[in-house]
Amino acid sequence: MSTYAPFAKPLYVMLKPVGAVCNLACDYCYYLEKSKLYRDNPKHVMSEELLEKFIEEYINSQTMPQVLFTWHGGETLMRPLSFYKRAMELQRKYANGRTIDNCIQTNGTLLTDEWCRFFKENNWLVGVSIDGPQEFHDEYRKNKQGKPSFVKVMQGINLLKKHGVESVSYTHLTLPTTPYV
């Protein structure tokens, strides 16, 4: 007999393990000024202690047998792979028979074979931010030195494909890009 209420709805929370930390400086980003809020700790990232506390409490608060962890940024891949491996260890520790799923949003520029193997082996859904064709994407999504990022993003997308990682795209729509949707 299930211990979950038949009318219960899942609780969804977005984790931001890097806060506003990012390797890009997109024109429309609402996080660019956030680092000024954390002058004493500009890297304002989630500690391992907070990670464990959050995972335990988030799983225990669920009223459904499936738990979804959504990792968002800043740029989520600015945290080392070891951080996410630890997160999965903690998810297993506190799962209590629940199914745990993970999805992560990235700008794609830091994807490597190692990251993609991890995502594939652990069945993560990866969202990649790409703002349409190169001429539109590069107009808005530049690195901190003002250089365009489209080529790096496409390299990341190709790595996801190479490794068979399930992925989706996130696109910031503007009037000129809507015909491409």
Go through the PLM ranges and name each one:
Residues 2-4:
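Long amphipathic N-terminal alpha/beta scaffold segment
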Residues 7-49:
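Canonical Radical SAM [4Fe-4S] cluster-binding loop centered on the CxxxCxxC motif
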Residues 17, 73-74, 106:
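Short glycine-centered, acidic/aromatic-flanked micro-motifs in structured strand/loop junctions
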Residues 20, 24, 135, 179:
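Glycine-centered loop/turn positions within well-structured domains
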Residues 25, 29, 114, 139-140, ...:
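Residues that scaffold the ATP/ADP-binding catalytic core of kinase and kinase-like folds
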Residues 42-46, 76, 145:
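Pocket-edge positions in alpha/beta enzyme catalytic cores
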Residues 55-70, 79-173:
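Radical SAM/AdoMet-radical enzyme domain recognition
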Residues 172-181:
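Single conserved hydrophobic/aromatic residue that forms the stacking wall/gate
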